[in-house]
From Swiss-Prot:
Family according to the record: Belongs to the universal ribosomal protein uS2 family.
Sequence ranges of Basic and acidic residues compositional bias: 249-272
A molecular function GO annotation: structural constituent of ribosome
Gene Ontology cellular-component annotations: cytosolic small ribosomal subunit
Pfam families listed in its UniProt record: Ribosomal_S2 (PF00318)
Cystine pairings recorded for this chain: none
Region Disordered, residue ranges: 249-310
UniProt xrefs under InterPro entries: Ribosomal_uS2, Ribosomal_uS2_bac/mit/plastid, Ribosomal_uS2_CS, Ribosomal_uS2_flav_dom_sf
UniProt KW keywords: Ribonucleoprotein, Ribosomal protein
Protein name, entry field: Small ribosomal subunit protein uS2
GO biological process, one term: translation
Length: 310
């Protein structure tokens, strides 16, 4: 089953590109035709690229990776926040801070600062031990950090891949990802450079419906990857991996259980063998008794014979 249909792409306007005077010649191979001064993107190619990107994202997440959603333009902000939150992934939908990937250690300190500020009760002035002015300054700092870093609050390391809407607007994010060799999955409009993107999806990055549809597809891939990951984790809990060595205490426990089972089995076998050993002894005892009986019979017959002679 296809991830998305041609009809959905057409209804969302994914096929509309930019004006013919605003284009990147490298995108020529993805353009189907030109109509009324606007390029029309080849949706057959888009479908195949969507399937590839979907599989890549699913496999990345299934193997424990994370995908950062990036889209700061107005058309993408709502879809990015909604879909990333749905699948529990980090996102940036306001301003991209320079160094958010390449200088993540500093960004992480700011995230810790945000968590500290969230512990303060700004309504209770007396309990905080701060003046109203100090609380006001801290609340403004908290609001600023929440706006810029709220989407990546739970991120503890750089992501395994990034999903980007409009690579021209997010050129700083693309540059940082490429510098760290982080795979880039992105929508490519007719004015973008396809060489900057690892997993491209030719499409319209300006229409809200187009951006929402493609972002939802990537979020669905993440969701499927998470399901696969949880299934694999559940299977691993049930039984140890074949090549995984046991801990020393586990080995001792296992050997102790085996020894106990062996002793129990031997104890159960001994009573069963005893009757078998007694049976021949009983037969041996009965045999002489049986032989003695015929020997006694002639002795009993002898007096009878003497009486007849008398």
């Amino acid at each position: 089953m296809a991830v998305v249909t041609m009809r959905e792409l057409l209804e969302s306007g994914v096929h509309f590109g930019h004006q013919t005077r605003r284009w990147n010649p490298k995108m020529k191979r993805f353009i189907f035709t030109e109509r009324n001064g606007i390029y029309i993107i080849d949706l057959l190619q888009s479908l195949s690229y969507i399937d590839r990107a979907y599989e890549f994202v699913k496999e990345t997440v299934a193997h424990g990776g994370t995908v950062m959603f990036v889209g700061t333009k107005k058309q993408a902000q709502e879809a990015i926040a909604e879909q990333a939150t749905r699948v529990g992934m980090p996102y940036v939908n306001q301003r991209w801070l320079g160094g958010m990937l390449t200088n993540f250690s500093t960004v992480y300190k700011r995230l810790q600062r945000l968590k500290e500020l969230e512990q303060i009760d700004f309504e209770d002035v007396a309990a905080s031990g701060l003046t109203k002015k100090e609380l006001l300054v801290l609340s403004r700092e908290k609001a600023k950090l929440e706006k810029t870093l709220g989407g990546i609050r739970e991120m503890s390391k750089v992501p395994s891949a990034v999903w980007i809407v409009d690579t021209k607007k997010e050129h700083i994010a693309v540059g940082e990802a490429r510098k760290l060799n982080i795979p880039v999955v992105a929508i490519l409009d007719t004015n973008c450079d396809p060489d900057e993107v690892d997993h491209k999806i030719p499409g319209n990055d300006d229409a809200i419906r187009s951006v929402t549809l493609l972002t939802r597809v990537i979020a669905d891939a993440v969701a499927e990857g998470l399901i696969a990951r949880s299934g694999a984790a559940g299977g691993a809990k049930g039984d140890k991996a074949a090549g995984e060595p046991l801990a020393a205490w586990e080995r001792d426990l296992l050997e102790g259980e085996k020894a106990e089972k062996k002793d129990d089995a031997e104890a159960a076998e001994k009573p069963a063998e005893a009757p078998a050993a007694e049976a021949p002894a009983a037969e041996a005892a009965e045999a002489p008794a049986a032989e003695a009986a015929p020997a006694e019979e002639p002795a009993a017959e002898a007096p009878a014979a003497d009486a007849e002679q008398a």
